Amino acid sequence: TKDGKLVIFHDASVERTSNGTGFIKDMTYDELLSLDIGAWKSPEFAGQHIWTFGQLLDFCKETKMLLNMELKNYEVFYENLEQRVIDEICKRQMQEQVFVSSFNHISMQHFKELCPDIETGLLYDKPYLDMEHYVQRSNADNMHPRYMLLQYQPELMELFHGRGMKVNTWTVNDEENMKDMIARGVDCIISNHPDVLCRVADDVCD
């Protein structure tokens, strides 16, 4: 935020999912806190407000929830973002409970150099010409491909797992593709419908 708070939000600006306008980097936390970020989705979510990163970490620590945190720093630059995220995680001793990802692979390289104890993942949504060479040069722990890329290039599973990397795929919202990703051996499925995913995973495991 303008006053240096780390907040949880999907977009760089607030228009799409709130009753406000403007970029988060140009707004103070108090200004953001005045926004309703739930009503756009459904009246039952009206009155929801933006959380700080610290609030989310505290919730995850209390509930023992594993957290996949995406840094949204590929469109807007946020100074010292990596170190500030690391500081918040480490002061709560949650290095093994959080893994961090981004489409900004340079940021993830820097993050891993600053803190080898926190797992990092590289998000991507387009094929690479020479992925084998790319992962050889990477210090990331995980790969986060869009699920269709694993269907288009099934050999990627063997490549990533052969390098000791976890494969966490996104965003899988329908049952057939959930089953397909499980069958391919992915380590994690990111979905907008966790209730459906849990049911599918239970059915497959049974």
Predicted regions and their residues:
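Homeobox/homeodomain signature
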Residues: 4, 14-25, 90, 130-133, ...
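Conserved metal-phosphate-binding beta-hairpin within the catalytic cores
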Residues: 1-2, 69
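Short catalytic/ligand-binding loop motif for oxyanion handling, primarily in non-cytosolic enzymes
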Residues: 3, 76-78, 178
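Metal-dependent phosphodiesterase/phospholipase catalytic core, i.e.
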Residues: 10-123, 138-141, 145-151, 161-163
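Hydrophobic "anchor" residues
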Residues: 6-8
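Residue-level recognition of short loop/turn positions
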Residues: 2-3, 193
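C-terminal active-site rim and adjoining tail of enzyme catalytic domains
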Residues: 43-46, 121-206
